Amino acid sequence: MHKPASPFGGAVAGTELGPLRITVSATANERYWASAGVDHPTLRQGALYPPVAANLAILLFQTVATRPLLHTAQRLISHRRGEAGTELTVTGTVVERYEKRGREYAVVDALVALPDGEPLWTSIATFCEQ
């Protein structure tokens, strides 16, 4: 008999995620700014586009939750400015799992850090499986 896979790759509250190391190139960063329709002086100064933190939280969670996900909620906290081309380290924890209307949900608290370990962004994301 076939047993269905555990939701979210078996990740439960307390599951540690990462580290995931990633560099957002200047070209990719510019695409993020442009897709939002934003032309801001900090872009021309090389600043990373802060909402990219949401994508990094998704990539981090997908290292364990490999089935299709719906990204249902997001909260971002920006701690400081980061520069495009800088290696970022993303770590996190599944802080909550719950069921609502017959669907399983997971809340992930992810920290995006600069090479010196200082926090750049905190991303709190909620997911459900499709």
Where are these regions (language model features)?
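Short helix-to-loop capping/linker segments positioned immediately adjacent to catalytic or ligand/cofactor-binding
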Residues: 40-43, 78, 98
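Hydrophobic beta-strand-centered segment that forms part of the acyl-chain substrate-binding groove
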Residues: 50-94, 104, 124
